[in-house]
Structure formats: C-alpha cells, structure tokens
C-alpha cells in the first residue's frame, strides 16, 4: 500500500485532465481495500474508489482521498459444463480477456479492449459487440460499508440493465466491489450479431479470430487513450418508444435503431451526433472525435470543464434537433465527489 498526499490524478484518468486529490492511496490486496474503505466510511471522510479511471470526468481538484484499486488474482475451476473464474477487482479487464483466450476458456472475446478494471465492469454492466458483462457474470462480491460485511450477489440479484446495475442504484455509495465471478460455457457459441462479425457466419470461426476482429475494429474506430485523452463512448444509446421512433424515421429515413424485446427501440447515438453536424465540434481543446461521434476527446490541453461544456452542447443540440435526450456514460467528479452533468 502506498499513500501520496496532494497528488495529481492526470495519469489515473483516461481523459488525461490534470486535477489533483488531497490524498492518493493505492491498495494492493483485498484486505487493504476493505480496511481503508471501511475506515474512511466510518470516519465520514470523502473518498473516491478508482479503477482504471476510464469512466470518470474530473472537473476540478478532488478534496478527499482517492483509493486506487490494484488488487490482483485469478482463480479458476470447472465442472462438466462451465469454467468458473474468481477475479480480483484490480485486474485489468482486457488482460482478463487475453488470459481466458490463452488458457482456452473463450467467451469474453467480444469484450476485448474495453479499458478499465474488472471491479468497474459490473457497475455499468460494460458491453460491446453484442455481449454485456451480465451475460458472463456468475456473482459480484462487495464490501457493504453499512455493516462491514463481505457479500456476494448472484447475477440475478445485481439488477443489470443497459449500462446499469444495483451498484449504480440502491448500493451506490455504500458498497465497494472487491471481486467478480465469471462463468463461461465450455460449449462455446460465437456471438456474431454485430456488423463486422457477420462475415464469420457459417465459417467455423475461432475465438481468436473474433478477438482479432474486435481489436482491429476498435483500434480503427476509437482513439487510444494513451495518445489522445478519451473515455470511450461518452453517451449511451438512447432508448425511445416505438411511436417516437416511427415519428423520427418519417423525418430521418436513414436513422439507425435496434428493436428491443419490450417494444422500445435503441437508437444509435453516434448517428444522431453525426447527423446533427457535430463531428469535430469543440470547446477549447475538447472535441467530438472526427471518426467516432460517440467519443469526446482531449486534444492535449482540455480541462474537465471544457469537456463538460462540450458534452452539454451535444446534449442540447440533439434535444433540439431530434427531441431525444442523451445521457452520459462517465461519472462526473467535482471537488466533493460525483455530481450531475450540469454546467458549473
């Protein structure tokens, strides 16, 4: 465990914005994570649990303790039908995908190259290319800060939805994820529902081929946060009623939407932003990415407030042009913790 006072968080957020925290504590084990978070909670001190920093937007210096989760460890067992993995919260998600592929336990390849740690995956139910975390989740282990109990919720208890979970709802602020259980079927079935993967239908595709295709597609579409600051897709794909979709498709015949089982339609937020003429739009050094409209980038010297103002500009424009409200994926962090996506 290391403790660093008044420390810059620039290396710890993928937007690369330069704000500091009052104290940065890096914890290497589950027991350290439990002890530190329990102590901060009991003393009613402000703190922020940080994984890879790929789903936050800092807008000012944080006046509290940042707890960086660095706990590592993967334990595997199996039965006749499944592989079961117990994974510590500080493991890198993409490295877990690579590990499973290298050890002949496929099933995560569609989720390749998603930045961040394993402990963050359940919070917003990460997903890409036809697969979500909930599809491979067996359980989530968390510290209940109210009573100090280490608790496991089965998949069905986690209230997963589109970029949602109980950890963003009822357990927000009173739980710290310490590990997750992954369940992968031994009878592997490729998920080829997403565009670039459809070419593999009826080809006897391998997990490695899907992995390579996903990595290639993401590298073509999404900027590398090590080179250009970003948090991946900044906006959720909005879900609207079928009647609203019919109204919009009448005005915009090329509108991209995906029918959902409950009669609603999920719109492609990237299409909305692109067709609103917002690709390349900027505020200061923050900009909408030219290749992928869902992504907001830091061209080098953007502040968190620049990115926030740009996000609000995009939301306002889409609301005016299409009557649809976009929601942000990243958490906005101010001086005293998470706050609403509003201009301050």
UniProtKB/Swiss-Prot annotation:
Classification via InterPro entries: FAD-bd_PCMH, FAD-bd_PCMH-like_sf, FAD-bd_PCMH_sub1, FAD-bd_PCMH_sub2, MurB, MurB_C, MurB_C_sf, Oxid_FAD_bind_N
Top EC class of this enzyme: oxidoreductase
EC code: 1.3.1.98
Catalyzed chemical reaction(s): UDP-N-acetyl-alpha-D-muramate + NADP(+) = UDP-N-acetyl-3-O-(1-carboxyvinyl)-alpha-D-glucosamine + NADPH + H(+)
Record Gene3D superfamilies: 3.30.465.10, UDP-N-acetylenolpyruvoylglucosamine reductase, C-terminal domain, Uridine Diphospho-n-acetylenolpyruvylglucosamine Reductase, domain 2
A GO CC annotation given for this chain: cytosol
Described purpose of this protein according to its UniProt entry: Cell wall formation.
Family as reported in the entry's similarity comment: Belongs to the MurB family.
Protein name per UniProt: UDP-N-acetylenolpyruvoylglucosamine reductase
